[in-house]
Amino acid sequence: MGRMTTQHFADGEFAVSYEESIRGRDVFLVQSTFPSADNLMELLLMIDAAKRASAHYITAVVPYFGWARQDRKDKPRVSIGAKLIADLLSTAGITRLITMDLHADQIQGFFDVPVDHLYASSVFMDYIEKTMPLDNLVVATPDVGGTKRASSYARHLGVPMVICHKTRLRANEVAEMRIIGDVEGKDVLLVDDIVDTAGTITKSADLMLKNGAKSVRAMASHAVMSDPATERVNESGLSEMIFTDSNPYIKGSPKVKIISVANLIAESIKRVCSHESISSLYSF
């Protein structure tokens, strides 16, 4: 673990500095982009400082890649935020990116440096197989966009899959939702990549129970949990909400379970250093 300091100023600016020589060294900077603006700016400054200190390789390890939901121009006069963040990281000086469960796989193509895209599936699969009886399990996705993810889990577990089809009024507000498939008497596992305000995931859970599901759990890689997410989870029919620790979750809910991906990240860093394959680290 290297030594560095961050100095904060009265006007809100900050400066970073390395407290030891990193000349000719391979530097791995571990920083999720949440909270988004400050963490991203700090990461960019760390990258720039490492480059100016003559580091050999600079790898940004970003378990949660913010702005990933802005991956396309889906209406007039909007930015493609994910592409901009990729450009900023590359311009700052990274030589590689390690990230996990991108909202859209194609974001890897926004970078001109190698991207190692990890998946939390191996960590989640171990937890599922140890804690959830598979004979009555159904995997569900809270929206059509997550069908590929849910299908991979269902296929790997050998269980059926159902889909929640939703229409939105606007961002973070769901207008209508219906189930495609049968959940009567089943233990449902909802899988997603990001839970922000928890509107979609909790409405999906309540709809599953309304349609006869025996129980509903949810599993997502990244806990953004903007207000009123914790309240919604607590008041919903979810029996458990499972996240990784890609983001810090401090608000607290008795229903929330955090599973660490520290070993997954550490092993990926080790394999980058030893030039080994990373794809074998995850189940799918």
Mark where each language-model region is.
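PRPP-associated nucleotide enzymes
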Residues: 1-284
